């Protein structure tokens, strides 16, 4: 929808251009965060640099290789599977629209502007979205959230006061910067059992009960 209005602004001189500008500004100004219901936020994802995320094609191939059966199933598996399905469908429609726009825009400058917008802006958003949900399915949502917080703390800490290497998601339990709040469970050392003097009759009845 944003791309549609952008095309109108670039290529049309009809009265709908002004309306498209207003609608495009409204869409960009909407406070919609696709990560809120999963405990994350756009700000948390923004701590990760753009070159951190694989290409959309690689992410789609990864999702298909790992979760193809669940993604193609008519059953509801999890909110992350549903989000991946929707993102995959939206990306396919966006590519079809971008191809159509590229074929029908005569002005090379306008065509390059549309292609650049899709690749830079929309492409990054889809890469972030796909990476987040694939990672949540692979490592668990709590681990991914902990990683995002840990990376955010690391990247904002001056180099002189932080470890030389950034946290790595696959090794997070060993290298995380920020641990989850709350007491860690204590390991209780087994105490030696007290020997009780039992009569032979009591011992026999106990062994009979354990067999049942």
From Swiss-Prot:
PTM info: Phosphorylated.
Family, similarity comment: Belongs to the orthohepadnavirus precore antigen family.
Residue ranges, compositional bias (Basic residues): 178-206
Gene3D superfamilies in alphabetical order: Viral capsid, core domain supefamily, Hepatitis B virus (1.10.4090.10)
Compartments it resides in: Secreted; Host nucleus
Prosegment residue ranges: 184-212
HAMAP family xref list: HBV_HBEAG
Identification of the protein by name: External core antigen
Swiss-Prot/TrEMBL Sequence repeat ranges: 184-189, 191-197, 199-205
Region of interest (3 X 8 AA repeats of S-P-R-R-R-R-S), residue spans: 184-205
Signal peptide segment: 1-19
UniProt-recorded Gene Ontology molecular function terms: DNA binding; RNA binding; structural molecule activity
Sequence segments annotated as region (Disordered): 165-212
Pfam family membership, one: Hep_core_N
Keywords noted in UniProt: Disulfide bond, Host nucleus, Host-virus interaction, Repeat, Secreted, Signal, Viral immunoevasion
Residues carrying the site annotation Cleavage: 183-184
Assembly information from the UniProt record: Homodimerizes.
HBEAG: annotated span: 25-27
GO BP field: microtubule-dependent intracellular transport of viral material towards nucleus; symbiont entry into host cell; viral penetration into host nucleus
Highest classification ranks of the organism: Viruses, Riboviria, Pararnavirae, Artverviricota, Revtraviricetes
Gene designation per UniProt: C
């Amino acid at each position: 929808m944003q791309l549609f209005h952008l095309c109108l602004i670039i290529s049309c001189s009809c009265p709908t251009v002004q309306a498209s500008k207003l609608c495009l500004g409204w869409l960009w100004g909407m406070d919609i965060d696709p990560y809120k219901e999963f405990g994350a936020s756009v700000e948390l994802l923004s701590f990760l640099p753009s070159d951190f995320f694989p290409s959309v094609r690689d992410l789609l191939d990864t999702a298909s290789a790992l979760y193809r059966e669940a993604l193609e199933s008519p059953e509801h598996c999890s909110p992350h599977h549903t989000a991946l399905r929707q993102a995959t469908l939206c990306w396919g429609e966006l590519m079809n629209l971008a191809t159509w726009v590229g074929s029908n825009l005569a002005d090379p400058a306008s065509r390059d502007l549309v292609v650049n917008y899709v690749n830079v802006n929309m492409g990054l958003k889809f890469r972030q979205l796909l990476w987040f949900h694939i990672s949540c399915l692979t490592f668990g949502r709590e681990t991914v959230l902990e990683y995002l917080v840990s990376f955010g703390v690391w990247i904002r800490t001056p180099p002189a006061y932080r470890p030389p290497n950034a946290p790595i998601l696959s090794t997070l339990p060993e290298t995380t910067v920020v641990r989850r709040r709350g007491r860690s469970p204590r390991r209780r050392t087994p105490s030696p059992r007290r020997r009780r003097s039992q009569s032979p009759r009591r011992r026999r009845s106990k062994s009979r009960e354990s067999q049942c």
